[in-house]
Amino acid sequence: MPYNLKRLAGYLLGFVLFYAPFALFQRALGYLLTHTNYVQTIHSLCLRIPIEHILDGNIFRYSPVSVVSTIMLLLAAFCFGPVFCGRLCPAGALTELLSRLVPDRFKISWRSYTEIAPIRYGMLAGFCLVPFVDGILACTYCNFFLFDLLVNYATRGYFISLSSSLILTAFLWLVVFGLFTKGGRGFCNFLCPVGAAQSLVYALGCRLGFSWQMQVDKQKCIGCGKCAKACPMEAATVQEKQAQQAQLCSNNCIVCGVCAHSCPVQAISYGRKHDEK
């Protein structure tokens, strides 16, 4: 199967698994854990609330489906990288697709202006600390919820009035960090706590040599920069000081495989660190 069709199939699978009107994952896990039929929306899965309460000790007070799903998500990220983001999440895929509608000269390369990782993890830290001041952000700027609303409107004609925070979120997600961002995944890079939490455990797994990861064969790499140009997360760079060789940043790599597909000499692969040539 051609690579682009594989990616599309993965995101369609994610849509069927997690979003209305199907939500097969929530239905199956909900029935397994509680023997009840869960509402088929992204709310019953919510990965953001358990992450928000991971520091204050209230993580297990919420829906068992939500808590178990979050634990599964982080374990998968530790072992295999942020595969949910890179291969299943249709909310991220939508803005990546939208960005292709705008010529490159009109798009912002955020890496050219700032380091992504400090902002990414800083937002995650703030997100997890908010409960200590009796606040909650999980539902305030949720692009998953917005995607669910778009799907409900398209399939059922159902919509709700949006709060000012959700209107701002939609503008940032779809326009600023979507249409006019290189790769279309600016929201994923800077504002998504689910992606940042996965990246944190993935980066730890990479440093321990445990996680499967995208890796560069230094003997094959010719420093052409095609991977850096293609990467939707701007996680791939070519460092002149490193003999013009590509480097992949585990702090925001989502193991989507775009870099490997774009490499003309097949210098990038996915596997355990000890498999690196």
Language-model-derived ranges and their functions:
Residues M1-Q242, A246, N251-I254, V258-K277:
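Non-ligating segments of multi-cofactor redox enzymes
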